[in-house]
Regions:
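N-terminal amphipathic, basic helical "cap/leader" segment at the start of enzyme domains
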Residues: 1-107, 124, 267, 273
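Conserved beta-strand/loop scaffold segments within soluble protein domains that form the structured core
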Residues: 86-321
Length: 321
């Protein structure tokens, strides 16, 4: 699949075209990150050369669909999209390079759960990323309406020896009293890279879980932001990871309390051996209006070899008493 340009985007529907064009322009304007930036400190971003990858459509299979849950697929090659979905993406103003690249080239899966509906079984989305020299941009949207419940599992798979890059983005929204459970499983091969972003928003009395199992990849990074926007909302972030050889797992997290009496709980546990590395940096941010909020943040690492290395940097920012 060729690289999308502002001119080639003209063939898309009006709003859809503008979404992709704007994202493409933001990506061009965005500087390539360096380890001098706090959010990329300790990373291996200096080893990545985007020019060596060709954009490919994401091979995806989905199981667990049911009549109670709407699952919509919109591949990057689609010339048009539902207006409500286009309007949703049009609201994105992120200037982050990788988020903008994803928005410009995304293969989208949307999971929508209506008010009061409890999904009867987990929805499992599997991306098989075996194109050597390919870059993939899957994007998952989970939209859980009031008092609904859904569990989504997203798997990323590639074979050893396949040099690929995957840049996934998750947008999860839990309306009032909704329950959203998300699990990402990294089963990538030894030459694959991942630079991912998970973002959830919880409204009043909602409950969200963002979980990650990271086992594969040469360099695998996930930035996770759980935002509590409604009073009484709750979120958990959990990760389990293991790295060997020269692997590196890189986690950056945000627990944002923007409403009163909200609760967040984070537990990341992992082990590294040989000359493998892991990085965890996390921020708990409690806004001035988030009185009565409670937050927990725990990162535990087991170093199994003298050459292995684990970095852990917790941070706290409180604007209220």
């Amino acid at each position: 699949m060729p690289v999308l340009t502002p001119d080639s985007a003209l063939s898309l529907g009006a709003t859809w075209s503008q979404v992709r064009r704007s994202a493409h322009e933001r990506a061009i304007a965005a500087p390539f990150p360096t380890i001098d930036e706090e959010t990329w400190r300790y990373s291996r971003i200096g080893e990545l050369d985007l020019a060596t990858f060709a954009i490919a459509e994401t091979p995806t299979t989905i199981t667990g669909e049911s009549s109670q849950v709407t699952v919509t697929r919109v591949p990057a090659s689609s010339a048009s999209v539902d207006s409500s979905l286009a309007d949703l993406f049009a609201q994105s103003t992120s200037t982050d390079l990788f988020n903008s690249l994803n928005l410009a080239h995304m293969d989208v899966v949307v999971v929508s759960v209506a008010r009061g509906v409890v999904a009867p079984q987990p929805i499992v989305i599997t991306h098989t990323l075996n194109g050597d020299g390919s870059v993939y941009f899957p994007r998952l949207v989970i939209d859980a309406a009031e008092n609904s419940e859904v569990t989504v599992v997203e798997r990323f798979i590639s074979d050893d020896g396949v040099r690929s890059l995957v840049v996934p983005v998750l947008d999860a929204r839990a309306a009032q009293s909704a329950r959203v459970r998300y699990l990402a499983i990294n089963e990538l091969g030894d030459k694959s890279w991942q630079i991912g972003e998970h973002d959830s928003v919880g409204e009043r009395d909602s409950d969200t879980l963002l979980a990650t199992v990271a086992l594969g990849g040469d360099y695998a990074r996930v930035s996770t932001a759980a935002r509590l926007r409604g009073q009484g909302s709750n979120t958990r972030q959990v990760a389990l990871y293991f790295a060997g050889g020269t692997q590196m797992h890189d986690f950056r997290t945000l627990q944002e309390h923007a409403a009163p009496r909200t609760t967040s709980d984070l537990l990341f546990k992992g082990a590294v051996q040989d000359t493998a590395k892991s990085v965890y940096t996390g921020l708990i941010k409690i806004h001035n209006n988030a009185k009565g909020s409670v937050a927990y943040q725990t990162n535990r690492n087991l170093t199994l070899s003298h050459g292995a290395w684990a970095e852990s940097v917790p941070n706290l920012e409180i604007e209220t008493n």
